[in-house]
Amino acid sequence: MRYQLLALDLDGTVVNHDLTIDPRVNAAIAAAQAAGIIVTIATGRMYGAALPFATALNIQQPLICYQGAVIREAPSGHIRYAMTMPGAVTAEAVQMLLERDIFVVAYIDEVLHIAQRRPELDLYLSYHPEGAEVRLCDDLPAVVAEHPATKLLFVAEPEIVGPTLAELQRAVGDRLVTTRSHQLFGELTALGVSKGRALAELAQQLGIPQAAVVAIGDQENDLEMVAWAGLGLAMGNAIPALKAIANQTIPSIDDAGVAWAIKHLLLDATAQ
């Protein structure tokens, strides 16, 4: 099989915990591009937070952002696909989190809207050295009810994130998608949003068959994408659930797993 499209998760797959990219991964992505493979990013990050990594990797393709809620071209920023959250249920979810004293961020037009400044904001922004515009709101539920959000993200201790997501799933799971993107982060998006759905949309737009698509990830929010791709790969550091549904588990991020996969599974296959 000649693979034509490679979709890469960022954090834990391409980007290390210190927000660096292994030179071996950078070189392998360049080699894939030189071989004619379209390489893109599929991330929970907003477009503004994904673009610096796309630039560093010389990726000038549509990027899948916000867990698949948005497909936006790099570097122009042109939006090719977008799904926003219904106001009433988004306000309900925000209110639930605030009542439980959990820090929540609403993403509206690439601006982070918050109800109060707390240490969790600094923790979250530490993953975004490029910076982000933050807006303090007196009534965050009212703001999201009136202005459609692309995503909600909450920050909590690892032992709190799981139960909180379960509670949100019971309350709003028939109207919003809940997912875990990090041990400290839970996220909500519009019903139907997933990296897998966005990747299918992008492949269709590009005229690439499902069988020619490769996806690599490590977390819960990569499940649909890895399951949908013609070749779905789980990082060695991936959660067990992802390894269970992937076609293959590759080396961990510490061992430049993406570089290994490109060399042994994509370029060798393309050369055949």
Role assignments for model-derived ranges:
Residues 2-17:
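Asp-based phosphoryl-transfer active-site loop
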Residues 20-125:
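Active-site phosphate-binding/coordination module
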